[in-house]
Structure formats: C-alpha cells, structure tokens
Amino acid sequence: MPAVACSHGFCFYIMGTITALTAQVKNPDRVNVFIDGTFALGLAMSVAAGLRTGQEISRSELEKLDLRDEIHRARERVLRLLARRPYSSSEIARYLRRHQIDGEIIQNVIDDLTEAKLIDDDAFAVYWVEQRETFRPRSRLALRQELNQKGVDRETVAEALSEVDEIDAARRVAQKQAGRWRGLPETEWRAKLTRYLMRQGYPYDIVSEIVTEVWLANQPDEE
C-alpha cells in the first residue's frame, strides 16, 4: 500500500498507480482521478489529458497537476467575466482575490491573458471612455477618477482622455438637465445648472459657455 499525504482536502500518494479516470457527473469537462482505487483529486479534462489508467504517479506530480488545475479554473473564471465586457488588469486581480485565489496564480493568469491580448489596459481605457461618451457623458476629471479607481496607470489614462470632447459632453449633460428647472428666473436657473456641471468636474470656462448656450436654446422663438 503506497504512503498517503493529505492537504487542502486532497489526498496525495507518494507513489501510486492511476486505477481509474472518470468524468464527473455534474461537470463532464472535469475528470476524477483514482489512485490505487481511492479518489485523489478532480482535474479539468485538458489538465488530465496526458494521464492514463495504469500510469504510476508521484505526490509531486499530483501537486503539479493540482496547481495547473487551479490556474485553469482561475483562467476560466476570468474568461467568463471578460465575456461580459473588458476589464482592467487591476479589476481582474481584485476579482480573483475576492474568490480566494493565490497571488501567484493570479499573476500567472493575468500574464497569460495579457500576452493573448484578452486583458489590455490600453484597450480597456479607450473602451471605457467611448462607452461613457456614448451613453453617460463625463468630464475629463470624472473619467480620470473612474479609470484611476480601476487601477489604470496615469500614462494610459492620459492617452485615453486625449480625444475627449469635453465641450460636447458638457452640452449633452446640460441639455438633459435643463428641464429640471424650467420656469425658474434666468439667474436662478443659471446658478443651478452651473453648480450641477461644476460638481460633475467640468471647468468653469466650459460651464459658463454651455450654460449660456443652453439657456438661449431653450427660449421661445420671438415672432
């Protein structure tokens, strides 16, 4: 009978023979590995691809397979996340840490997917700015804060913001908000819209220009 060592819920054999490889009932993409008739661990099909019944295997080999499987599972978790939308590398790292993934595995996955261009902070920053410009216009200051929170470095943020049309963004925001204070005297209306745009991070010179433009555009035509 081979010696056995157990840790993290897995029992590893110092040396044993693979006696069965069976697909898991609930997840046929994973394989249960049995050594000398006893369950040892479960592996992704791709990780278990080189194993065969009757093969002798050591504890260190099983530990390497277990590590490869952890990396595979973390990678698959990230790929499912990326199917929703792009994410920055820092967002991915935080996401995996929340799922108790080891730091070395996190770095391995990020490096692998960055090399494959599936994680790309430059592309993510451009995507984020374009989405905001299309659906929820923001000032450069607000966009910079959002990208900083997502862990994007300053140089990448600056490049992504270089083409932002802040005047157009402020105009669209002002047009959307203008009706909230319809009927107020001009001075009060201007003050409210000015404060609102300033809170959104737009520079005063742009705010002043846009407030006047939107006020005039909302006045009834004189006959």
Where are each of the predicted segments found?
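N-terminal amphipathic/hydrophobic targeting modules at extreme N-termini
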Residues: M1-F10
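An alpha-helical, amphipathic repeat domain used for nucleic-acid recognition
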Residues: F10-E223
